[in-house]
Regions:
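Compositionally biased terminal segments of proteins
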Residues: 1-154
């Protein structure tokens, strides 16, 4: 499964003040609002900055700041860069349910199969979905993904 890489990066900034500070820095660097969350400049690269505990419309069950909910990538003098746990990455993508998001989730599942328990994923997804206004629709996304995973990964 090979496809061109996108030129964007999704960042979750849990602290509202830090989110505002980061937006200000991007504006100083010439970035302009490109969408509800996106900031871009003429090179086409987009930063999607999500505030608080939500990615797009997905409200995470727990704070990404909790140690078990992220992995440190790099710590700079004023920036802590971490990546969400695999479950929250997959859940936030499956809530959108696009083909590209499904491909991303399958790729992650294949690459990290020994670290991702499908029963845990399903339980966590169902709990997250129970708080969403479109619970039925997102549950269909999960069912579709599990069928794909059964065919392609398991």
């Amino acid at each position: 499964m090979s496809r061109p890489s996108t030129k964007d990066i999704d960042l979750l900034v849990p602290n509202e003040d830090e989110h505002g500070y980061l937006v200000n820095i991007l504006q100083q660097l010439g970035y302009k609002s490109a969408s509800g969350w996106g900031w871009s400049r003429e090179d086409g690269f987009i930063f999607d900055l999500f505030r608080g505990n939500s990615i797009h419309t997905t409200q995470l069950l727990e704070s990404s700041l909790k140690e078990e909910n992220h992995t440190l990538v790099k710590e700079f003098s004023r920036v802590y860069l971490g990546v969400l746990n695999y479950y929250d990455i997959i859940i936030s993508k499956l809530f959108r349910g696009t083909n590209v998001d499904n491909e991303d989730c399958l790729f992650l599942l294949k690459a990290k199969r020994s670290e991702i328990n499908l029963a845990t994923l399903e339980k966590r997804f169902r709990e997250t979905a129970s708080y969403d206004v479109s619970e039925g629709a997102v549950m269909k996304n999960l069912e579709h993904f599990l069928r794909l995973a059964q065919k392609e990964v398991i």
